[in-house]
């Protein structure tokens, strides 16, 4: 995200990694509402978040990739159901995609069913919504959302020492369209 003096000391970073070349990179700021909270003895408000994107080609077919890390409203005594701005911007971006699309990230929604339902209205499913992905509380915070041109063939939640979140990994194939095309 853009530089902000309010950023907490651990920072937030996003990346998209691919075995195939990335192109048409995008970034979209996801504004955070001015919810006040106390951190390290001082009153502050949350920093904005980010949605990054890129396109790549796999097997001769273009794919749109997105990654995000949304605000953890539940840690501020609020919820993304009350403050829907970041989620609504994601849903709009996904709804505009005309390509096979993957959206990955830490969505920080403690009651993730409402997020899954919202993105389903934009034509997206998540590869899983049962296995806990965060070590600190039994929440499913991390997701891989995909649209109908793609079909998941395998997924797993793998413990890792690299993060306080477990790694969510998945393999996809292109779904065969009606008429075998």
Kindly give the residue locations of the regions a language model identified.
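Structured beta-strand-rich core segments of catalytic domains in phosphoester-bond hydrolases
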Residues: 1-62, 156-159
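Active-site-proximal beta-strand/loop segments in catalytic clefts of secreted hydrolases
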Residues: 2-3, 19-20, 30, 68-71, ...
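N-terminal, active-site-proximal structural segment of metallo-dependent hydrolase catalytic domains
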Residues: 5-11, 81-89, 175-181
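Conserved hydrophobic/aromatic beta-strand scaffold that supports enzyme active sites
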Residues: 14-16, 51-55, 67, 143-144, ...
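Short, solvent-exposed loop/turn segments at secondary-structure junctions
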Residues: 20-22, 30-33, 70-73, 108-110, ...
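A short acidic, helix-capping loop that chelates divalent metal ions and anchors anionic groups
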Residues: 36-38, 73-77
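His/acidic metal-ligating clusters that form di-metal
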Residues: 48-66, 79-107, 116
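Metal-dependent phosphoester-hydrolase catalytic domains
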Residues: 92-102, 107-181
């Amino acid at each position: 995200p853009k530089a902000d003096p309010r950023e907490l000391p651990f920072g937030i970073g996003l990346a998209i990694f691919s075995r195939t070349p990335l192109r048409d990179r995008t970034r979209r700021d996801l504004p955070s509402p001015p919810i006040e909270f106390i951190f390290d003895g001082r009153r502050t408000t949350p920093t904005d978040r980010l949605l990054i994107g890129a396109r790549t080609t796999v097997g001769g077919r273009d794919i749109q990739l997105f990654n995000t890390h949304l605000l953890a409203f539940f840690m501020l005594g609020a919820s993304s159901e009350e403050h829907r701005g970041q989620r609504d911007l994601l849903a709009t971006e996904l709804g505009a995609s005309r390509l096979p699309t993957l959206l990955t990230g830490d969505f920080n929604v403690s009651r993730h069913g409402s997020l899954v339902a919202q993105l389903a209205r934009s034509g997206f499913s998540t590869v899983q919504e049962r296995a806990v992905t965060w070590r600190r509380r039994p929440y499913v915070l991390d997701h891989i959302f995909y649209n109908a041109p793609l079909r998941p063939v395998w997924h797993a939640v793998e413990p890792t020492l690299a993060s306080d979140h477990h790694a969510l990994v998945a393999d996809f194939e292109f779904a065969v369209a009606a008429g075998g095309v």
